[in-house]
């Protein structure tokens, strides 16, 4: 499979989004099937796998999807780019505290479930207006310097937030909704990312099965 660069990361041209192994697209498959599917994708050349801490089996518990992915890729972890995402609730944010500790707590839990000691690409799953993006970006930079993550990204974000974040710590990738029937990214996100050398990782490129 062809390779592409996302910042300092080399990824396969096609990545595997793993959310459907936990929820979102009909009946949740058996774990054994999910693991086999992920490993088969790797056998065919896929070296870019995407998950999130919030992907849970029918919302039973946080981290279900990360656990599946961690088990599946353990044997070839060093050969792939592994992306996951965190969600920070308003209740977790203390304006007088250090948001870094919140990020580190989430990341540590994700790494445990993923059976790894680093994450290649760590996204903020959704921007929370109650939490300044500048503080998130600064903390992501610290995680990069400490070697806990190799790059960071934003998911479903607009240019105003992306630009503020990128000024603090260069953003590796943006993961926004994009397909032949959902093309808003072409207006502002794509031009900004091209100008600033930020990778774009579309989610739902087949419009959740419509295409």
Language-model features, listed with the residues they occupy:
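Conserved, mostly hydrophobic/aromatic
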Residues: 6, 16, 34, 41, ...
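Short, acidic/polar
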Residues: 28-42, 96-115, 135, 158-164
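Feature marks short, surface-exposed loop/turn motifs that line or immediately flank catalytic pockets
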Residues: 20-23, 55, 88-90, 125-128, ...
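Structural motif corresponding to the early beta-alpha repeats
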Residues: 55, 75-98, 125
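Conserved residues at the C-terminal ends of beta-strands
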Residues: 17, 52, 122-125, 155, ...
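Alpha-helical scaffolding within the catalytic cores
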Residues: 1-4, 67-70, 106-107, 160, ...
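Beta/alpha (TIM)-barrel catalytic core signal, keyed to glycine-rich beta->alpha loops juxtaposed to Asp/Glu
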Residues: 127-211
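N-terminal binding-site loop/beta-alpha segment at the start of enzyme catalytic domains
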Residues: 1-80
């Amino acid at each position: 499979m062809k390779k592409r660069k996302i910042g300092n990361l080399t990824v396969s041209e096609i990545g595997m989004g793993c959310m459907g192994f936990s929820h979102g697209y009909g009946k949740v498959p058996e774990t054994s099937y999910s693991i086999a599917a992920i490993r088969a994708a790797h056998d065919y050349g896929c070296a870019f796998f995407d998950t999130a801490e919030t992907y849970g089996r029918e919302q039973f518990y946080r981290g279900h999807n990360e656990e599946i992915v961690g088990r599946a890729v353990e044997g070839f972890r060093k050969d792939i780019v592994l992306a996951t995402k965190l969600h920070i609730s308003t209740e977790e944010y203390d304006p007088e505290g250090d948001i870094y500790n919140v990020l580190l707590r989430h990341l540590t839990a994700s790494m445990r479930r993923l059976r790894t000691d680093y994450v290649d690409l760590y996204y903020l799953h959704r921007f929370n207006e109650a939490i300044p993006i500048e503080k998130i970006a600064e903390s992501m930079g610290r995680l990069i310097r400490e070697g806990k993550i190799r790059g960071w990204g934003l998911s479903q974000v607009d240019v105003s937030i992306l630009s503020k974040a990128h000024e603090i710590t260069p953003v590796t990738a943006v993961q926004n909704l994009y397909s032949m029937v959902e093309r808003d990214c072409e207006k502002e996100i794509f031009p900004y990312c091209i100008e600033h050398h930020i990778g774009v990782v579309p989610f739902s490129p087949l419009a959740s099965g419509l295409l």
